[in-house]
């Protein structure tokens, strides 16, 4: 029973013939037709193209996606006849296929299409190009291999120049959204503070209408001698003369004196 990785490795083994027939390529001498295993690369390339068309506003989007699906179905039938198994096109994508490939240097499984497994440049010569990371193929000559190994091919989908503008727009919208929320909250806080200040001023203005304002009986602000003033009538009711205390507290003259 074949697995997806078996199919992928078969395709890699035949990849040097995938561009045939081509008189300019020495390996194509006498080859009249590309091996059916190359359908794996066809599907991967179509999946990449399909992914890009899904997120376009082009009026031909529906028509293009329909044609791509038909082409994928043709290659899927070819692979089914060859291996006798149903292969999901979603399993034949560049970033998934990398799990099945073998490191040319160490023999380890997994990694990305760049200087390590089935070379990205080799695929381009054959007419199949995995979506390059941001910066395009220039990055593969400008950066050392150790750096490239840290970039999983899964990110190829999202860090390529064609898709980067899409994510930059999303990032810009997020930044603008955060800025809008911060400005809105700041304005709301200022509005609340201003409203509270207006309420305090209105409250003070109402209090200033007290008929006893600026007298010893004013109700605002609170009188610190209030308790003593309340005790004086109590003592006077018992017959004491509280004239001196009334004078000190600013109270009018009372009885018993």
Curated annotation (Swiss-Prot):
Main location: host cell
Residue stretches spanning the membrane: 123-143, 163-183
Record flagged with keyword Protein biosynthesis: no
The organism's place on the tree of life at top rank: Viruses
GO annotations of cellular component type: host cell membrane; membrane; virion component
Keywords, ordered alphabetically: Host membrane, Late protein, Membrane, Transmembrane, Transmembrane helix, Virion
Keyword Membrane: yes
Induction, as annotated: Expressed in the late phase of the viral replicative cycle.
UniProt subcellular location: Host membrane; Virion
Coiled coil: none
Membrane topology classification: Multi-pass membrane protein
Similarity remark: Belongs to the asfivirus C257R family.
Protein known as: Transmembrane protein C257L
Source species of the chain: African swine fever virus (isolate Tick/South Africa/Pretoriuskop Pr4/1996)
